[in-house]
Amino acid sequence: ILRYLALLTATLLPGLYLAVIRFHTQILPTNLLLSFADAREGVPFSSVTELVLLELAFELIREAGVRVPGALGNAIGIVGGLIIGDAAVSANLVSPIVVMIVALTALGSMVIPDEEFAAAFRLLKYGFLILGGYLGIYGVVLGIYLTVSHLSGLLSFGIPYLVPFVEEQSVRQTGNGIFRIPFKARKYRPVYARKEQSIRLRKITDRKGRES
């Protein structure tokens, strides 16, 4: 569940922030709205521009950290992010809330274990950012619809990419796609593997407990 939340944060958070701050401010409490307004006072760029610029700066730092070997690469990523973020806020180029949004987005993408998988969602983030920045919540919903529609049409070795969510399955099978139970406790096979024999084979043990 934590990885799913991290994936949603890394993909949707910038777009949702722009949608709320530009089009749907009425859903925010007054005190929070005033805090956002005070934080943006004096910033010369629009909220979309400052968020895109800071995201690109953090992507450059990430790439620099990957290219530099050893512990120095990690140090460049951490120290570089802190220095650039603090300098940008001190120079009144970006607001502190945008630095927080970018930092949370970066942390969410780091939780995703596969780097190529995470890179795809980092690119998708910019699409949601533009849609949310210029179309509001409706743009974010449109982006989700287009993304899910595309993923639903993909096949991996003849199996739908979003199995077990795109086919009519039991609650048990759908739940297995969200929760990871211990392997020894799994009684049933995945829905795409040998449907005629859904129960997994068990190891046979003799009376002394030895496996055969």
Where do the model's predicted regions map?
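Transmembrane alpha-helices and their extracellular/periplasmic helix-loop junctions
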Residues: 19-22, 34-39, 45-50, 97-100, ...
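Alpha-helical transmembrane segments and their membrane-interface boundaries
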Residues: 1-66, 71-75, 166, 170-178, ...
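Alpha-helical transmembrane segments of multipass membrane proteins
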Residues: 15, 56, 60-63, 82-87, ...
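Membrane-interface elements of multi-pass transporters and channels
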Residues: 24-27, 39, 64, 68, ...
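Long, contiguous hydrophobic alpha-helical segments, chiefly transmembrane helices and signal peptides
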Residues: 1, 15-18, 84, 92, ...
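Hydrophobic alpha-helical transmembrane segments of membrane transport and translocation systems
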Residues: 98, 103-212
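Alpha-helical membrane-protein architecture signal
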Residues: 29, 33, 80-81, 124
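Conserved glycine-centered short motifs in functionally critical loops
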Residues: 66-69, 75, 80-98, 102-116, ...
